[in-house]
Amino acid sequence: YIPTDNTAASNTEAIANVVIPEKVPVVAGEEGICKGCGVAALSISYYDLGYKTGEMAAEILADGADVSTMPVAFAPNVTKKYNAANCEALGITPPDGYEAIAD
């Protein structure tokens, strides 16, 4: 598993050069990493995450909410994606409900 991480996102080709020949499937935390070196992802939407962050900022700045008492918020939706080429190379059939990542 590779979570959402800028270093990993910048090095997906190097990761793929190691994991694909060794037949190691990588599940990624977001679509970009999955497209580069993964087989599947429950991908967050950075737009939705940013929108939620904006709502929380408004609660703090406009409404005076105490950040220390606010609950942790999560990305409201995830999308199920898979990398068709990597799945084929590793002999993996993606589960129903997953959408192929466009090239």
Enumerate the language-model features and the residues they cover.
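Second-shell loop/turn segments in exported
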Residues: Y1-D5, V39-Y46
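Pocket-flanking alpha-helical
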Residues: A9-S10, C37
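A short acidic, amphipathic alpha-helical/loop segment
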Residues: N11-V18
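Flexible loop/hinge segments that line or gate small-molecule binding clefts
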Residues: V26-A40
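Hydrophobic alpha-helical segments within soluble ligand-binding/sensing domains
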Residues: I44-A65
